[in-house]
Amino acid sequence: MSEKEKGKFIVLEGLTCSGKSIQVPLLVANLTRKKTGITAVLDSEPTNESFGRVARAYIEGSPVAFLDRVAKRAARELVYSSDGVSRKLTSVLECIGRGERISIIDLQLIFMADRMRHTDKIYDWLAFGKAVIMDRYALSTLAYGLAQGVSIGDLVVWHGLILGKRKIDPDLTIYVRISARTAAERLAMSGKITDINETEEIIKKAETAY
């Protein structure tokens, strides 16, 4: 039996304000409360690890000094690879650290690197028979990348290069469906500071991509 087969990997996907971030902890709590014998773990992307902090800081428009600090920390954790991936990620991190705008595909590379570095934790949880309930995973990369004009081919190729054999396919993906209009209305009412992925136009295109 492989490590992955010992536990279950369940992902909730959806547009901004779809309610998935509410449903994930509820699902974890219900699995625990109903004495199913399943130990459930709540997880989400972007993570709170180095590349996840870079991604979040960039899309939220954080000050350059903070971007520089988190980008340098992530760069120190890069492992050299002969396929050019580490050089590419280093270049993207340097641009972010200088406060420069990066392309959408380069931003998605940071999300992918965050996913890659987090897979060891997911594999460990699964190996111990835990159910990992994840708020966003690879489909978010595809949906929001496509919504901003990146080709599916480029996204798939880079995802394969960065994650390689570390890629984990979910046992179940649940799409929490709401319309782009409802998502935009909820976002406006929430008072939340929006990031660059949360414009009404991108939300509409992400709905189509999903």
Regions found by a protein language model. Give the residues of each.
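Hydrophobic positions on the alpha1 helix immediately C-terminal to the Walker A/P-loop
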Residues: 23, 27
